[in-house]
Amino acid sequence: NIGPRTYAKICELLLRLKANHLAPAMHPVSTAFYKIPENKLVADTFAIVMGSSHCEPLLLNTASEWNSKTMGPWDYGKNKDKINEVLGNRVKENCAYENVYTLALRGLHDAAMGGGDVPMKEKVKMLESALKDQRNLIAEHIDRPVETIPQAFTPYKEVLEIYSNGLELPDDVTIIWPDDNFGYMKRLSGLHEQKRSGRAGVYYHVSYLGVPHSYLWYSTTPPALMYEELRKAYDTTADRIWLANCGDLKGAEMQVSLFLDMAYDIDSFNANNVVTYPARWLAKMFGEQYYSVFEDITSSHINLAFSRKPEYMGWGYWNNYWGGGEKRTDTEFSFANYNEAENRLNEYSRIGKKAENLLASLDKDSQPAFYQLLYYPVKGAELMNHMTIKGQYYRQYVRQQRAAANLIKEKVKNYHDSLQIITEGYNSLLNGKWKYMMSLKQNYEGSSSYFMLPLMEESYTPVGAPKLALQAESEILDKGGISYHSLPVYNTFSRKSHWVDVYNQGSGDLSWTAKSSNDWIIVSQKAGKTPTEDRIRVSVDWEKVPVGESIKGSVEFSSNDQKECVLVSVFNPASPVRDEMQGVYMEENGYVSIPAAGVHRKFESNDIKMNILPGVGVEGHALQLGNPISPLQMYRAGDVPRVEYDFYTFNAGIYDVYTYVLPTFPLHAERDYKLPEHTNSDTKYSVRIDDGSISTPSTSAIEYSQVWYDSVLKNCRVNKSTLYVKKPGKHTLQIRCGDPGVVIQKIVIDMGGLKRSYLGPESTKCN
């Protein structure tokens, strides 16, 4: 359990990290801090200022220390005197030590205070009364003016609604603004709150237990996101207390170091250098000669986890509240479209191999620390993604009756077993120094199942003679057997290649040949022999292909008496000329895809500057529409600050424009925040094509809604605007500033050809 020896190590670590404040473990599985008298002596020896979480008033761990059988209900309306007696004793016992006293009235176990359907006015009145009582207890036991004693109030979850409905809070109390548990600050100090003598602080999560899904295995919170959110907090007077929820700490060491370094000197950071923090942090420990490889591995690892954390790969929800456990399902990464799943797995394999090679090259004394800090997180994420996505591959292979199905099944089992092995390796380092510290299961029994072997109940054993079957890129088939297939249209402005899977549905070796109908069709392999499958790349020789908007050809695949044909269509118009379209985002297969950082023109003002943010967003870079604390903009005004992108379409019509945005909340200082915590006001920006109508989507969503669930799990809200394009040709897409600080990740325009995927297609820029 956690006692003085553990807290001595924690307090020493805090001093080494330039920290001086600790809110100890609060869940019943850990012995409450003040149940062991030596704990506070340890903290005092290290000059650590003790505090407590948002639901623990006056240092009392209500989840563990309140005994309803002997003390009565934890209900301020029914048991006020006993509650105040216990709280007063806690202050009396600890008044000789340095503390920050939390003023709070929440229920047990991080829940809302009970009492039924109480009108909001009564909730406000009750909380004000409780806070007044707690202030009186502090004044009674500490011989100093109460205004000089550090006190904190955290408007977390339902308490924010009460605060927003007129709660009167003493001016000297520090308001600790919380994030939404997923790294997005829900609210910051407005102009009137910035004048408070108590100023403000932050309560920020780099680890979390709760809905829609916990992330407790190890932290992958992006440094760029942390800086973007915490900088705007600091700039609005949240500079008094910074508190990070770091779970069991070991899995969040880099994020905790960054959090405290920013708390100590945030002005030494900016949007560019914070991205390299993980590499610099590692290089300081293992040698500057490894900096470039550290930067490559960490930037890719964080970017991959940005769109889906390893803990979320089961694609279900943390389900402890409703019973029955997490319901796992297929991921939304596409196997058929935009090479999405394949690219993700290939990138994980690349950085996993780099981390493996680096581990082997280090001296033995450095290997244990490197194993924990980089190798295990990267290799673990690689194996988790391969296990989950390949498990989904297996289920598809069975439906297609591919002979390779059982090979995939064995690989999935190996990924699962390897996860157990590297976790056991972590816990056996240095003769078991960190034994039990790392576990794949970081949750209540049954509430999450992301770490378990994927469902593979079906099986397929190929029988009979070898049998030819095909799947072409962007083709979704449950079974092979059709004799006609088509690839995505080849476009002279992108000049991509596409793939065809040649696979065997029988046993034995499948011998096959491929024959192109025209000399401008290039096949990567013209013949083969495989017991399972071959992937063939089909490309176009653009020096030989005729000019035209609908050039047709084909590739015929044969095996014995079987023949299957793949249609090859080429779009190679005489006009516009490819060289004249350099840098323009071109329509391709019925869509246009634009990375938000790939701006053609910026229109800025004294207040609003457009900034490229590296290290954040599904494309690795994103665009921020001004500083978050800048004045609100009139997004319909003609001269509003905006960015523009040039795109070209070959058809007119009504099209859907999808904007991928960071799911931030409205934080502008002049906003009216009198709203419940689960009905936050919208954070607006606007979208326009040419001089057409203006659409005004939002980045925020009602908390605990399905939109919010999806947005925080993806670190992205996808908004649809339906706009009109009058005629074919070159057009301008505008993204216009409304609430400053909105972060745009990418834009996709669907002309009718957009396929299903998780992150959308890659850029269609003509280069």
Please state what every model-predicted region is:
Residues 1, 13, 44-49, 53-121, ...:
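Aromatic- and acidic-residue-enriched carbohydrate-binding clefts of CAZyme catalytic domains
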Residues 1-77, 95, 152-155, 166-184, ...:
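Feature activates predominantly on carbohydrate-active enzymes
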Residues 15, 20-23, 30, 177-183, ...:
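Structured mid-domain segments that build the active-site/substrate or prosthetic-cofactor binding neighborhood
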Residues 20-22, 40-42, 47-54, 98-102, ...:
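Beta-sheet entry/capping signal
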Residues 34, 42-44, 72-197, 343-369, ...:
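Gly/Pro-rich turn-and-neighbor structural signature
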Residues 333-499, 555:
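Histidine-centered catalytic/metal-binding microenvironments
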Residues 485-486, 493-767:
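Extracytoplasmic
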